[in-house]
């Protein structure tokens, strides 16, 4: 059956040629069903048991879990099947045609992160999965680039409990054991419109928001003072005011003002605690103006994540690569996979190429990535 598996570069080419864009805008959003079915066929050919899982609340999106081996524990290799949209005017190549030039493989998803599945398949093409002493799981998720709905749903509903997991996001083969979370929040203030010549006849939402922002700034300073993690370049939780919209004319009392902000919590900080701190900070405004201030999530929140530095997975990967683990500020699906088992983020390609025009993966990553996958599978599934 394995004779049917295409060569590495042809697997890569087929993955890139199969669009699977995730977007909040419905017109741009695409199902990943074709890509999932393609992966399902290849992993079946390698002897894996394949399960395709519809993801509720999405526009026809699916997860795939391929399983081989018996017993408990083992290794999970995970990644997402979707990409971000692309700006056609800024690409100099067809995003859906894998193009090799000057030591680089170009295409949408080459680095972030369809290519990781080509590496897994290629590393396993000569493996008899019936000889595994522990389970090997391959997880392909949906909607990482928007809501992370695939990883959320999988982690909440699966019964598998591997010994450890590796998520193949582009880290330039630098193992990552921790990252901050992300909370994207809106604060909306409702006033009462009126003619600006008589301010007493209205309630100016901008003035109420001014009060609210002042209290949010106090919270920002408090977070910086109270929470610290020396491993991060920015060692405290950040709070950013991203956009502010309110009013429609200079001679009208503003009836509505809305602030969009984000908080990037450190590992170990709970989302409930942070939401509580924000509500507490804005309580004086709410009490003075009942019913006029609301707080809501713009996107599903992502907690911070950290793999224990003394875990066997960290020690094994550091020894194999000769590289110490690091931490980053961007987010991945690791917080959700970490609820199942200790997790590292580690994969080929550079994060600097993710979400960029003419995205590429350097061919220098091909050999070491194939070797790394072979080694970790051997260590965690045959020992």
Curated annotation (Swiss-Prot):
Its main location: cytoplasm. CDD domains: M20_ArgE. The lineage of its organism: Bacteria, Pseudomonadati, Pseudomonadota, Gammaproteobacteria, Enterobacterales. The gene is argE. PANTHER family: ACETYLORNITHINE DEACETYLASE (PTHR43808:SF1). This is Acetylornithine deacetylase. Its cofactor is Zn(2+); Co(2+); glutathione. It comes from the Bacteria. Zn(2+) 1 binds at residues 80, 112, 169. Binds 2 Zn(2+) or Co(2+) ions per subunit. GO terms for molecular function: acetylornithine deacetylase activity; zinc ion binding. It is an enzyme of class 3 (hydrolase). It is found in: Cytoplasm. Catalyzes the hydrolysis of the amide bond of N(2)-acetylated L-amino acids. Cleaves the acetyl group from N-acetyl-L-ornithine to form L-ornithine, an intermediate in L-arginine biosynthesis pathway, and a branchpoint in the synthesis of polyamines. Zn(2+) 2 binds at residues 112, 145, 355. Pathway: Amino-acid biosynthesis; L-arginine biosynthesis; L-ornithine from N(2)-acetyl-L-ornithine (linear): step 1/1. GO terms for cellular component: cytoplasm. Belongs to the peptidase M20A family. ArgE subfamily.
